[in-house]
């Protein structure tokens, strides 16, 4: 091969190639294929520039004879082939005189007519794969890319080929000749296979050993290597290449790439039907707390003691009665269950020593509410495998529900500030490194914005309830244990406060698998009259249990106090995640942090302080039918936190599906906004996948309606 190179190429080109290789510590005698590739590339660059001039009128002309006309200026500046220092000097001087953006990598030519740098590529592989690698490396809109292959194909940025047909034909003919010459000497195959992908500094991450073998084994058919596949995947250009590729890969696939324009997307279709109902494990905005300040009673911190103490702060109890029955339930049983709780709490007080936990008597009303003996008997498969008509229960399709306004109100409420702090700042040691100092500063600013947020109250309430329920489920499997729903906070003045929201009674809980269900009955205090939005409370039986005196601007008013009772269930895995709800704080902090980082990298200094302290600046919070909503940085923190908390409270398969599928549509719309000219195939299928998740879940329906607002404003 070395002999061939020295015979085939002009001695000046050979010398430049040797010099270039030596600069990188490579030996032309050993790396002969690389030697040939560099010579070829140099020759193409020179041929690209040959005979092209700019006349005195600034027009591009072709002059092939040795016309000694001094007024002609070379159209192209050749950068390739110079030593690095000289090459960068030329590039800098061009940038200074023309104002063109300075490229990150050394380009090959500069075109004085079009005022742009040109990156020339010569490839033994497919032009579009090599083009994408180049584009990936260059990462600049300003540098023009032009790729030639040894088979006569070419590809250039925006299909703008710079040169006339004849000049390009000359280059293609020369490349074809080189290929023929190599083939006749038996050198072509080795040369063709030796081409490596473009390396960029940041992507020189090698996968080796077992991981490499696994990667190569798991490639789709028709791909020889991981690099090949990577380039192919990165290379989505909606110009026809991909349709051909898809049809090569499978006869069943025929994808027509459709351009995605402002008029393409339609709004998501939300389901019709009765309004959706509340399905959280505990009440949110409607919860009412019975509280004690500065608790110092005997046994303080033991939930049952705290609960009894809180119950004693209220004097307005009255004979309970059902005000909103549960359509499908036996409502008198819910009433009896509450009366039983009151009676058994009274019994505890009459005892000399209050116990630490309370197991309820297994009355008929509790057995009914907790589904005791309701589970079908389990039969060993061996005993029934011969039954001819063995089949699974038919299950009904879920009934579609429409979006109701209460879920938006719930979300708004979760973003609000309360008058208590729900977060104790953990003591973390002194900062040692500067990065720790920045981290502490960010954490402290963020905490200040969210510690009083209602979403933080929901986190603490969720953590407490799930921890207590999981503990009881393991410690008292067969008992109907009474579990108070408690939270702790600090008032504005810094006084400690213990709150009681109501009670849970747990059913039998022999939880072997993560998904085994434990039933529980929840009984929660509230001042919300259920008759105002009966559809929200479909799953509840609501009792009126007392009258509460409230201080208002016009003096004291008496309001009825309600008890929201329902049967519910959860599993080990759900309780485990519920116990980890504090992660929501971390997730929203990270989202805020990425906003700070973006700001800091623009300003080239840490912007944490300015970010939180510049009260005049507003930030986008979300979309509503009115347009993009904006607010203070504190509001952004609380909104992000509330979203994260609701994702946890309303976790469901519908949410998983909606998030994953709608994200794809979101990315396409973002690409359109960024003027990246996205193309799609089977957009109808994507809409189907998204809309199949819009059934009856209130949080998913709300997110879908927000998504529609976003579509409207993004595509204006």
Curated annotation (Swiss-Prot):
Subcellular location: Host cytoplasm; Host nucleus
A single cellular component GO annotation: host cell nucleus
Reported modifications of this chain: Phosphorylated on serines and threonines by host kinases, including human casein kinase II.
Obligatory cofactor(s): Mn(2+)
Keywords, sorted A to Z: Cap snatching, Endonuclease, Eukaryotic host gene expression shutoff by virus, Eukaryotic host transcription shutoff by virus, Host cytoplasm, Host gene expression shutoff by virus, Host nucleus, Host-virus interaction, Hydrolase, Inhibition of host RNA polymerase II by virus, Manganese, Metal-binding, Nuclease, Phosphoprotein
Motif Nuclear localization signal 1 (NLS1) per UniProt: ranges: 124-139
EC assignment: 3.1.-.-
Molecular function in Gene Ontology: endonuclease activity; metal ion binding; RNA binding
Binding site for Mn(2+) 2: 80, 108
Pfam families: Flu_PA
GO biological process: cap snatching; DNA-templated transcription; symbiont-mediated suppression of host gene expression; symbiont-mediated suppression of host mRNA transcription via inhibition of RNA polymerase II activity; viral RNA genome replication; viral translational frameshifting
Similarity field: Belongs to the influenza viruses PA family.
Subunit structure: Influenza RNA polymerase is composed of three subunits: PB1, PB2 and PA. Interacts (via C-terminus) with PB1 (via N-terminus).
Protein name: Polymerase acidic protein
UniProt gene name: PA
